[in-house]
């Protein structure tokens, strides 16, 4: 199943880039745990379920950024876990620039994301991009 999980996650990034939040949310388990570390005006905490992710994460991104890009680079298959290393970039509505790498950790079960964790590479760059 892990190769299928990698394909699922790869497709989710493509859908996110096309602003198709509904398609991304459909890949989440009904009780998904979505973990964001926070900083600046970024989402912070654990969001449970797709509706909480939509309102607490995706809507916050849209409200804060004119440009927001999540560019996956490397996909690492770890069985029921998929780790993605990539790069965030963008410009928030206050003019601050977001520019840092990331590691995203997806735990999968039955083809759905059951847990996600966002780990920006540079906390100060993450906070700076979300401030202003």
Regions found by a protein language model. Name each.
Residues 8-10, 18, 23, 32, ...:
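Low-complexity, compositionally biased segments
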């Amino acid at each position: 199943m892990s190769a299928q999980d990698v394909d699922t996650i790869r497709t989710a990034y493509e859908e996110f880039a096309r602003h198709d939040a509904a398609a991304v949310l459909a890949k989440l388990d009904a009780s998904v745990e979505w973990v964001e570390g926070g900083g600046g005006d970024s989402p912070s905490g654990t969001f449970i379920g797709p509706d909480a992710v939509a309102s607490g994460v995706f809507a916050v991104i849209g409200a804060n950024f004119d440009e927001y890009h999540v560019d996956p680079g490397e996909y690492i298959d770890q069985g029921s876990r998929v780790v993605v290393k990539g790069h965030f970039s963008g410009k928030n509505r206050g003019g601050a620039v977001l520019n840092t790498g990331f590691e995203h950790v997806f735990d999968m079960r039955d083809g759905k994301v059951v847990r996600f964790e966002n780990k920006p590479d540079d906390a100060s760059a993450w906070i700076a991009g979300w401030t202003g």
